[in-house]
Curated annotation (Swiss-Prot):
Exhibits a very high intrinsic GTPase hydrolysis rate. Involved in the addition of a carboxymethylaminomethyl (cmnm) group at the wobble position (U34) of certain tRNAs, forming tRNA-cmnm(5)s(2)U34. It comes from the Bacteria. The keyword Repressor does not apply. Residues 218-361 form the TrmE-type G domain. The gene is mnmE. GO terms for molecular function: GTP binding; GTPase activity; metal ion binding. Its EC number is 3.6.-.-. Its cofactor is K(+). This is tRNA modification GTPase MnmE. Mg(2+) binds at S232, T253. It comes from Methylobacterium sp. (strain 4-46). It is found in: Cytoplasm.
């Protein structure tokens, strides 16, 4: 990483201020070239005229910040240019930066990649930063901040340090098995007890289920039922906008319509599906119903809407919702947990939202999960499996195999933090960041 990179760190629309980030060994010379002066005092905003070094033309009067490494986001010498936010100003400065020797435009995620490679962040913190950028609800923000602050990273580092000590003892016992000063029985008692504690802690973290992963993805609520049960009307009422076409003609909804919403700080994905009936459907509607059944199977919660004239039996586990209460008929809401609502008047919607929020909260938690990605889960499961084999085989397996399981357990924890075996994944992860991050 000998080159110096630059990129806008703010949005591209018209704004009061536009920020450009610079990172790398040429950051100081870049400031000197633009301002005609040495870098200002570190970590202070300083007003400077920015000029094109080739022509002397004034580009902008801007606030500049000089951030000498390694105590920076990337771990390198860095600088920021706080420009007036017009598109022409930003474009002119970027054009001049691109002509300076040794400078190159940053790829998406390039600044964060440098922070990771320079040891400023581990991989769990990088993933937390990505989740924070994508967070749409309070619970997602809270979970992302915990990861960014090192909730999982600190645990993994502590577990890894413990296992490295156990492994060192096991390897010493192997290397010096003929020496009398190596207490193999003490290693077996204390070392394997420590390994068991780490394994139990990992299993406890995994016992949370997939709450962290599901919180990132959202709680999927599928609106299902017979045609003309009021699914699209309910979707529009919950979304507070006309997301779906509403028509008295059966079969209007042919494909699933998805709407993301924030429900009590939790991410919820509402899915309006094609109405289900046994006969009279054309081929297109039949395909829509097949897709509806697949979405029902994949849902976290199914709201089974029943119109006043009734309909088919609800799938197992579905929340039955009697619709069109405004027509004045008594659907018997409240029996066996069923609800009665009117999407037109709003009657019963608050109670329905409370039920959905309770189900989402039970499934997702409130951002306190430690494991938030499938990659993390798989590595921790692998570590626990190796530790389980080492502990179970301590008395029966050859010592070399026990030590090998300990080595593989340490390696699996290293993968969680990004120390080993993550090269291919890094490109995918960093490409999901915006330019300038």
């Amino acid at each position: 990483m000998t080159d110096t990179i630059f990129a806008p760190a703010s949005g591209f629309g018209r704004a009061a201020v536009a920020v450009i980030r610079i990172s790398g060994p040429g950051a100081a010379s870049c400031l000197t070239a633009l301002t005609g002066h040495p870098p200002p005092l570190p970590r202070r905003l300083s007003l400077r005229q920015l000029r094109d070094p080739g022509t002397g033309e004034v580009l902008d009067r801007a606030l500049v910040v000089w951030l000498p490494g390694p105590a920076t986001f990337t771990g390198e010498d860095s600088a920021e240019l706080h420009l007036h936010g017009g598109a022409a100003v930003r474009a002119a400065v970027l054009r001049v930066l691109g002509r300076l020797p040794g400078l190159a435009p940053a790829e998406p995620g390039a600044f964060t990649r440098r922070a990771f490679l320079n040891g400023r962040m581990d991989l769990t913190a990088v993933e937390g930063l990505a989740d924070l950028i994508d967070a749409e609800t309070e619970a997602q923000r809270r979970q992302a901040m915990r990861q960014l602050d090192g909730a999982l990273g600190r645990l993994v580092e502590a577990w890894r340090d413990t296992l490295l000590g156990v492994l060192a003892g096991a390897e010493a016992a192997l290397d010096f098995s003929d020496e009398g000063d190596v207490d193999e029985s003490a290693l077996s008692a204390s070392g394997l007890a420590a390994a068991a504690r780490v394994r139990d802690a990992i299993l406890a973290a995994l016992a949370e289920g997939r709450r962290g992963e599901r919180l990132r993805e959202g709680f999927v609520v599928v609106l299902a039922g017979p045609p003309n049960a009021g699914k699209s009307t309910l979707l529009n009422a919950l979304a507070r906008r006309e997301a779906a076409i509403v028509s008295p003609i059966p079969g209007t909804t042919r494909d699933a319509i998805e709407v993301r919403c924030d429900l009590d700080g939790l991410p919820v994905l509402l899915v309006d599906t094609a109405g289900l009936r046994d006969e009279g459907a054309d081929p297109i509607e039949a395909e829509g119903m097949a897709r509806s059944r697949r979405r029902i199977e994949e849902a976290d919660l199914v709201l089974w809407l029943v119109p006043p004239e009734g309909g088919a039996a609800a799938p197992k586990g579905a929340l039955v919702v009697h619709t069109k209460r405004d027509l004045g008929r008594d659907p018997g809401g409240g029996v066996d947990g069923a609800l009665a609502i009117s999407a037109l008047t709003g009657e019963g919607l608050a109670m329905l939202l409370d039920r959905v929020a309770a189900a989402a909260g039970a499934a997702l938690g409130r951002g306190d999960a430690v494991v938030t990605r499938e990659r993390q889960r798989r590595a921790l499961e692998e570590c626990a499996a190796h530790l389980g084999r080492a502990i179970a085989g301590a008395e029966t397996m050859p010592a070399e195999l026990v030590a090998e399981d300990l080595r593989l357990a340490v390696r699996a924890l290293g993968a969680v933090a990004g120390r080993v075996g993550v090269e291919e994944m890094l490109d995918r992860l960093f490409s999901s960041f915006c330019i300038g991050k």
